């Protein structure tokens, strides 16, 4: 019985990092497809169009709920923090899985 538990633990140790890496790659792809055109593929922002998300203090401190709200509902010009960027952020419709992936990347991998 103990041997079986050890084998199961070793298999899990080998499989789960690969699953996490694959999910991370999927999250990056979701970000690039959904956000990259305006915010840059690496989150660096585009002058006059959209702010940088990498290193962005609000993104780092915002709750997942706040990020989800902005991503799915957008932001009108008067609600924006960046007055030098005239275009409002559009609302985005997507699956919960895609939304969670983008938020995970915004809060994690993008900030590294």
Protein language model regions, located:
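Sequence/structural segment immediately N-terminal to covalent heme-attachment motifs in c-type
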Residues: 23-44, 68-69
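Axial heme c-ligation environment in periplasmic c-type cytochrome domains
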Residues: 47-54, 73-101, 106-112
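Soluble non-cytosolic domains of exported or imported proteins
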Residues: 25, 61-62, 93-97
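Gly/Gly-Pro-rich "capping" loops immediately C-terminal to redox-active cysteine motifs
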Residues: 44-72
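N-terminal signal peptide c-region/cleavage motif recognized by signal peptidases
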Residues: 15-19
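Charged catalytic carboxylate motif
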Residues: 30, 66, 98-101
């Amino acid at each position: 019985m103990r041997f079986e538990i050890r084998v199961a633990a070793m298999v899990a140790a080998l499989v789960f990092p690969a699953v996490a890496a694959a999910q991370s790659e999927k999250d990056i792809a979701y970000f690039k497809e959904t956000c990259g055109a305006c915010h840059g593929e690496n989150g660096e922002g585009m002058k006059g169009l959209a702010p940088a998300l990498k290193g962005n203090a609000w993104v780092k401190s915002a709750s997942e709920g706040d990020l989800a709200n902005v991503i799915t509902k957008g932001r009108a010009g008067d609600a924006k923090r960046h007055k030098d960027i005239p275009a409002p952020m559009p609302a985005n419709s997507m699956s919960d899985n895609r939304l969670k992936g983008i938020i995970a990347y915004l809060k994690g991998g993008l900030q590294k």
